[in-house]
A protein has these predicted regions:
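Short, glycine-rich nucleotide/cofactor-binding loops
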Residues: 3-15, 146-156, 300-307
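N-terminal phosphate-binding or glycine-rich loops at protein starts, especially the Walker A/P-loop
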Residues: 1-43
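Glycine-rich phosphate-binding loop
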Residues: 90-109, 188, 193-195, 199, ...
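Short beta-strand segments
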Residues: 6, 35-36, 58-60, 101-103, ...
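Glycine-rich phosphate/diphosphate-binding loop of Rossmann-like nucleotide-binding domains
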Residues: 14-16, 28-33, 39, 51, ...
Length: 343
């Protein structure tokens, strides 16, 4: 298995992706191709006391870099020799099994769609991060920003691909799928939610997914469902709200434990649990967000990812390769089309 990694993408590149790749190769036995400016990559290695490339790690030179100001729609034509575009081309050409980048989300999504292509029958790829929940598992939220405007058919497909991903990657036997709404009643929401509800319910009645109805935002961190379906605008707001709440709770707890001597002693007694709590909410432990609906695994790492985050993104990519959902998803979509359930 070969994982292609954009060595120039993200706020901490090339240091973080290079060192994360080396750690991942050591810990997981992965073969990793670092795509980027060869001299810059070698300087990182030298600066960290590494004279030669570790076993399993190789460099594919790319002279250019995609930055956040580049127009996503023009990146492929204007920067064909960039680390991101070259990495996606390598994935499309079969020179690797998955691609990871912490670069521009828009450019990565556009490049993945045009170069790697969507799964046959999929109308839009979606960003599907897996968030920890109160039930002890993870909840996939999709879409989380790739598609601000959606049709009911898009939301139906998000439910299908999210359910398959939860089965294959999160080992959930019968994932519960819910539609994000302002209430649980089936009459709630805009025309988009009402029409999507009907399509998802029909898919549930036909045994394609385990659709449990509408869910509210507060139900998501509680683990009421395994997959939350929504448009990219609502999903991104939901995700950022959960992240902000987690940061607030962490800051509040830190202040409480530093208030006086007694609270500091209490903190010492529960320090192990505090560290476990922080780890649970640490985005670096997850790795990145997959673009679901693309033919091969493409993972968007957080822009501020450090070496640990890249290491875990490699592990996440390996899991995605091992639990490939493409064939099963194509079969499901083909069956729906034959039965007239896909408009």
């Amino acid at each position: 298995m070969r994982i292609i990694l954009d060595a120039m993408g993200g706020d901490n590149a090339p240091l973080a992706p290079v060192m994360g790749a080396i750690q991942a190769a050591k810990d997981f036995g992965a073969e990793i191709i670092l795509v980027g400016r060869g001299e810059a990559i070698l300087e990182v290695l030298k600066g960290n006391g590494i004279d030669t490339l570790p076993e399993g790690v190789e460099i594919a030179n790319a002279d250019d870099v995609v930055d956040m100001h580049d127009d996503p729609a023009r990146v492929i034509r204007q920067k064909p020799n960039s680390s991101m575009v070259m990495g996606l081309k390598m994935l499309s050409d079969g020179k690797g099994d998955a691609f990871i980048s912490a670069g521009s989300t828009g450019a990565l999504l556009t490049g993945a769609t045009l170069l790697v292509k969507r799964v046959k029958g999929i109308r839009r790829a979606a960003m599907g991060p897996a968030m920890p929940n109160k039930a002890g598992g993870k909840t996939i939220i999709l879409d989380c920003g790739a598609n601000a405007e959606c049709t009911p058919e898009f939301l139906l497909q998000f439910g299908l691909v999210g359910s398959l991903y939860a089965k294959k990657n999160l080992s959930v036997e019968n994932p519960k799928v819910g539609l994000l709404n302002i209430g649980t009643e089936d009459t709630k929401g805009t025309p988009l939610q009402k029409e999507a509800y009907a399509l998802l319910k029909d898919a549930g009645d036909n045994g394609l997914i385990n659709f449990v109805g509408n869910v509210e935002g507060r139900d998501v961190p509680l683990g009421a469902v395994d997959v939350v379906v929504c448009d990219g605008f609502a999903g991104n707001v939901l995700l950022k709200s959960i992240e902000g709440t987690a940061m607030f709770m962490g800051s509040l707890m830190s202040k409480m434990f530093k208030k006086n001597l007694l609270s500091k002693l209490a903190a010492m007694l529960v320090m192990k649990d505090i560290k476990a709590f922080k780890k649970l909410l640490d985005y670096r432990e997850i790795g990145g967000t997959p673009f679901l609906g693309i033919r091969k695994p493409v993972i968007k790492a957080h822009g501020s990812s450090d070496a640990l985050a890249f290491r875990n993104a490699v592990h996440q990519a390996m899991d995605a390769v091992n639990s490939d959902i493409t064939a099963e998803l194509e079969q499901m979509l083909g069956s729906m089309k034959e039965n007239g359930n896909d408009d």
